[in-house]
Curated annotation (Swiss-Prot):
Family indicated by similarity: Belongs to the eukaryotic ribosomal protein eL22 family.
Taxon lineage: Eukaryota, Metazoa, Chordata, Craniata, Vertebrata
Subunit structure: Component of the large ribosomal subunit.
Gene responsible for this protein: RPL22
Name of protein: Large ribosomal subunit protein eL22
Positions of post-translational Phosphoserine modification: 66
């Protein structure tokens, strides 16, 4: 049998990867149908780190609010999709799911937009 070579990684430690995602709540906050402080509190209670909610990994995940934008910064693996899932859960809990949707407007951010219902209704009336 041939000898088995073991690969040894050269170098030191891995660089910590910092993930930063933003949630833009400008339109619903300006219209006063949503409270950004309440949504920030919801995210703090629901985000799980290492399988535990309300944990936030001892500072590994931070949630900051500036005006109508919520920024989630993470040093541990955190997916953008998980932020969308929690945002949709918040909308459902507060009965806003029928009026708002979560849309990705860049690679690292989501935006809450209204459904375009008025245009659809006008088109249906024109067809009748």
């Amino acid at each position: 049998m041939a000898p088995v070579k073991k690969l040894v990684a050269k170098g030191g430690k891995k660089k910590k990867q910092v993930l930063k995602f933003t949630l833009d709540c400008t339109h619903p906050v300006e219209d006063r149908i949503m409270d950004e402080a309440n949504s920030e509190q919801f995210l703090q209670e629901r985000i799980k780190v290492n399988g535990k909610a309300r944990n936030l990994g001892g500072g590994a995940v931070t949630i900051e609010r500036s005006k109508s934008k919520i920024t989630v910064t993470s040093e541990v693996p955190f997916s953008k999709r998980y932020l969308k899932y929690l945002t949709k859960k918040y909308l459902k809990k507060n009965n806003l799911h029928d009026w708002l949707r979560v849309v990705a407007n860049s690679k690292e951010s989501y935006e809450l937009r209204y459904f375009q219902i008025n245009q659809d209704e006008e088109e249906e009336e024109d067809e009748d």
